Amino acid sequence: YKIGEPVFCEKDVHIQFYPQEHIYLYDGQEQFIPVSSVISCFFKPFDSYYWSEYKANQRNISQGQILEEWDSKGACSRDVGTFMHQQIENYYKGLPYQQEFSFKYDGKYVHIEEQISLELEYMQFIEFLENHKFKPFRTEWAIYDDELKIAGTIDMIHKRGDVFDIYDWKRSHRIVDFWGKPIAVNNYGEKGLGELNQIEDTPYWHYCIQQNLYRYILERNYDIIIEKMYLVVFCDDTNEYRKLEVPRMDEAVSYTHLRAHETLSDL
């Protein structure tokens, strides 16, 4: 299933993505806002100061240690996720696929140096390939909307006749439950802001909105019709990958589109 030469699109030359910094540059100069940052504007931010103080008092340790513990977990999750995406891209390019990641964190309170195995995730990816024997149209495709000045990266897109399907790789314990169903309800009753106030504040719904915004960008700027969108979850707490079809969320896309200029000006 190795992908051949990338299908060239005249828009590709204008956008550059730097994954470590998570920065998109338009024509090497103007910075575009990642779609994930756009979505976060429509949900209440986590009050890390309040909750770290609460947890520190509970455990009788410093607030700084709590914040570092959270920061190290977040850094590990992001770094391993980025690494997994790179390895999947290597597979499609015919390059060696590594199954172990070296994570280091050296803070004031937290010091971590460990090897993290992605053997289970790799096996799940191979199982996905066995069940989806098609050649991708594009992988790791940076796309953008130059009017809204937003950009994002599609993990894999498949051409099926005259339409396309989007696939998004995820490595997370917070998207599906033990039975493989999406975690679609926030346990604390928290929801989105404004007209998104009926959408539960969970990673699952954040990713669903993200895929719908990718669909919007592609259909508006690339003359591509998106038929299906999927989240594909690889995780070390199960032997099987999980494939979730993403629902169309036209109202959410319309609202985020209309509010984008106003909201992003505050970033």
Feature roles, as predicted:
Residues N90, G94, I217-N221, T263-D266:
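Active-site catalytic microenvironments for nucleophilic, acid-base chemistry
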Residues T256-T263:
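Conserved small/polar residues in nucleotide/adenosyl-binding loops
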Residues I199-Y230:
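Metal-dependent nuclease catalytic cores in nucleic-acid-processing enzymes
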Residues I143, F234, A260:
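Hydrophobic pocket-lining residues within nucleotide cofactor-binding pockets
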Residues G4-P6, S72-K73, S77-L196:
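Catalytic cores of nuclease domains that cleave nucleic-acid phosphodiester backbones
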Residues D223-V246:
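Substrate-binding beta-hairpin/strand module that engages nucleic acids
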Residues Y1-F83:
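Charged, glycine-rich intrinsically disordered N-terminal tails and low-complexity linkers that flank
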